[in-house]
């Protein structure tokens, strides 16, 4: 049996966050290419996000909290009874490869954020005791990021996004805590806030560097040890 990888585990947790952002549509009002979806739950969806309706990715133009979501699309949504969030997105790997994935095939990168970004796992602690329930404990660095307008935003504006991403990080930790075969209930984690975040790499010399990720990003970083039980390798991620 193939081992379940850490990135598969974390992707599953992020999928649960996305699945929790699904709600019924009580009625639909059409006005040309705009559709007002009356719904009792809007969660953290904002203008500029994309949501899924009838399998179509549609652009959000207005949100009235827990009342309605207005979207723009050329597709017919008049029969819609449910909407689903497309966020948060999940990216894993080294920064260069992730940036290439995010920017590939789309000029509209609003569809790619907010996101949970996980760097490659470099360090794990393994148990050699046969009686130990824990298989190994990877140390994870996760970034919860959304786009921000650096040039026109005040520090207070940026920290509204930081606070929103901290809420998402805490939601992630809570979901991780109820994931079978994971033992983080008694763990601590470090959290760093980034009003302006980027990853710098050295290109041709130590005097020259380049910031990766082609978007202005704001959010939080967490570092946490995640004890994973041996039983996970004989189970499904359900």
Predicted segments with their positions:
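Short, charged interaction patches at domain edges and termini
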Residues: 1-22, 125-135, 184-238
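Short amphipathic alpha-helical segments
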Residues: 5, 9, 157-168, 172
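Extended low-complexity, serine/threonine- and proline-enriched intrinsically disordered segments
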Residues: 9-16, 46-52, 165, 169
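Small/polar beta-strand repeat architecture
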Residues: 22-33, 40-45, 52-102
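Short beta-strand micro-motifs in enzyme catalytic cores
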Residues: 33-36, 67-70, 136-138, 218-222
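Short, solvent-exposed beta-alpha or beta-beta edge segments that form flexible loop/patches at the rim
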Residues: 51, 88-156, 200-218, 234-236
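Short beta-strand-to-loop capping motifs
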Residues: 73, 144-147, 224-228
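Acidic, metal/cofactor-coordinating or nucleic-acid-engaging core segments within structured domains
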Residues: 165-191
């Amino acid at each position: 049996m193939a081992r379940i990888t850490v990135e598969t585990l974390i992707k599953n947790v992020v999928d649960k966050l996305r699945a929790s952002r699904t709600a019924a549509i009580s009625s639909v009002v059409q006005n040309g290419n705009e559709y007002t979806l009356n719904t009792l739950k809007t969660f953290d969806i904002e203008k500029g996000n994309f949501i899924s309706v009838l399998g179509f990715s549609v652009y959000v133009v207005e949100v009235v909290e827990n009342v309605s979501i207005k979207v723009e699309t050329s597709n017919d949504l008049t029969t819609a009874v449910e909407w689903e969030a497309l966020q948060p997105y999940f990216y894993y790997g080294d920064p260069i490869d992730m940036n290439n994935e995010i920017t590939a095939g789309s000029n509209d990168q609003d569809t790619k954020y907010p996101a949970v970004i996980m760097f490659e796992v470099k360090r794990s602690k393994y148990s050699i005791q046969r009686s130990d329930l824990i298989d190994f404990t990877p140390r994870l660095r996760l970034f919860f990021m959304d786009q921000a307008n650096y040039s026109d935003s005040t520090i207070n504006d940026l920290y509204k996004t930081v606070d929103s991403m901290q809420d998402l990080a805490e939601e992630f930790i809570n979901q991780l805590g109820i994931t079978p075969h994971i033992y983080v209930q008694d763990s601590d984690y470090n959290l760093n806030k980034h009003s302006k975040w980027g990853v710098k790499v050295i290109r041709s010399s130590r005097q020259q560097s380049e910031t990766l990720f082609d978007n202005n990003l704001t959010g939080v970083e967490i570092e946490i040890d995640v004890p994973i039980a041996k039983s996970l390798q004989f189970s499904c991620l359900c």
